[in-house]
Amino acid sequence: QVEADPSVLNLSAFETFYEEKRPFFSEGASFFKNRLNLLNSRRIGASPNYFDPDSGDLENVSDNTTIIGAIKLIGTTNSGINYGFINAMTKEESGDLFIGDNKNRFVVEPQTSYSVGKLEKSILNKFSRVGLMYTDVTRKNSTGANVLGLDWKIGLINNRLFSNGQIVRSNTDESGDAFRFNVGYKNATWWESRFWLGSYDDKFDINDLGYLRRNDMTWSGMMFKIRRLEPIGYLLGSSFEIKLNKKWGIDDILIEDELSIETW
């Protein structure tokens, strides 16, 4: 038995994200997880809603799409390449469409195949790796979608100099692009600094199998922190942090401009 989702009152224009609780999909899910979430397995077996009738009343529709079958492979090759693959097939879902005195069957969700694959390889040292991930949604007699993403995590100088990020392209009716990265340095004793930058264009869409709160957005920011871990008199330690973060939306409209200063 799968734990039910909590009740959420969502008054925003954005979709609510629910955590995966089905063991088949939740076990090993961390391998596919990244900041830009290309796999939201809750799409598989979700409420059927791909097609909406232009008129009439739709009744007798299943609450969830039926999963016909699924397969998952996760492991590591002899050469040290980590791999993961998931494929699931869902059946066509229909309902009764009433228009006046007429009743017809209406396809709400076509038969669909969901696939995701990822390869990951350690490079340079134990702190660094690079990954390549691909997702595909194929709908019977309907438009599908696919996404290709490159991600990395690099750590140098005993992981004091670090960077991570993603570059992603989506293909639905149109192609869209996105990237995000941050780079930073953490001194072993008293300071650290970080810079980040990212952008999703207005055609970027991964929501057939992933989760994206919104597209058409650019952001950048920086953080600088000074810390002292050794006691000074009666003080056990002290820190100072300054952080600047900006986000722009449609037509370069500023949607967030944050400056924060913290001491403790």
Language model feature labels by segment:
Residues 8-14, 100-110, 149, 182, ...:
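Flexible, surface-exposed loop regions and adjacent strand-edge segments
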Residues 1, 73, 119, 149-152, ...:
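Conserved structural-core and active-site-/substrate-pathway-adjacent residues in large, well-folded domains
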Residues 45-54, 95-100, 127-134, 157-166, ...:
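Flexible, solvent-exposed coil segments and beta strand-coil junctions
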Residues 2-75, 85:
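Residues that cap or anchor secondary-structure elements
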Residues 66-68, 74, 145, 158, ...:
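Exposed, low-structure sequence patches enriched in small/polar residues
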Residues 56-59, 95, 100-106, 135-138, ...:
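Extracellular loop and loop/strand-boundary signature of outer-membrane beta-barrel proteins
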Residues 81-116, 122-125, 129-134:
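Active-site substrate-binding loop specific to GH73 endo-beta-N-acetylglucosaminidase modules
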Residues 114-171, 230, 237-241:
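Surface-exposed extracellular loop regions of Gram-negative outer-membrane beta-barrel proteins
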